């Protein structure tokens, strides 16, 4: 797997194990299997989206990486898998919830155990999300369903 990095600050692209695209403003014209935008909101606009139609997946680590909902819907209709930012960025929220609602378990556990729990919870939600996408629901509909879903406080589910 090749991992490419681009940033307006070229020094930030010097990451071991990656291929730097430097500060290339036309980075999106390259062919990628997976894109993980970790930058400003609205990065993927209509102009950029047209170059991403061969991409297999976009994992949205940036908050609101698409310029508007129509862009993400067009990419979804082109069979590009999009994992939305609320799912991708859930780890910190889950860890905070453990610390708040299970403080005893939090204080006696090793970080690796928390990471494993977080990874498991995020993975479950991502698979549930992908299953609902395949059933024909839109990202917006799924996120509303997940938001309105009644469930236990996730931090209380962590048992060390």
Annotate the PLM regions.
Residues 1, 31-32, 54-55, 77-78:
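Short coil/turn connectors at secondary-structure junctions
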Residues 1-34:
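Glycine-rich phosphate/diphosphate-binding loop of Rossmann-like nucleotide-binding domains
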Residues 6-8, 38-40, 61-62, 86:
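Fold-independent oxyanion-binding glycine-rich loops
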Residues 10-13, 44-47, 66-71:
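Short, glycine/polar-rich helix-capping loops at beta-to-alpha or helix-loop-helix junctions
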Residues 17, 47-50, 70-72, 95:
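Short amphipathic alpha-helical segments
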Residues 19, 36-43, 62-67:
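A general structural motif
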Residues 24-31, 41-59:
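Rossmann-fold NAD(P) dinucleotide-binding segment
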Residues 55-160:
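Adenosine-phosphate binding glycine-rich loop
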């Amino acid at each position: 797997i090749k991992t490419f990095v681009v940033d307006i600050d070229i020094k930030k692209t010097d990451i071991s194990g990656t291929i730097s695209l430097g500060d290339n403003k036309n980075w999106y014209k390259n062919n990628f299997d997976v894109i993980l935008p970790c930058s400003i909101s609205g990065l993927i606009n209509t102009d950029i989206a047209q170059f991403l139609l061969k991409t297999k997946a976009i994992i949205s680590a940036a908050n609101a990486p698409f310029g508007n909902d129509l862009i993400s819907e067009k990419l979804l209709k082109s069979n590009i898998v999009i994992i939305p930012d609320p799912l991708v960025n859930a780890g910190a929220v889950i860890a905070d919830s453990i610390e708040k609602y299970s403080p005893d378990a939090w204080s006696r556990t090793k970080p690796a155990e928390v990471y494993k729990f977080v990874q498991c919870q995020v993975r479950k939600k991502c698979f549930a999300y992908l299953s609902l996408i395949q059933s024909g629901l839109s990202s917006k509909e799924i996120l509303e369903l997940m938001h309105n879903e009644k469930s236990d406080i996730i931090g209380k589910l962590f048992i060390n």
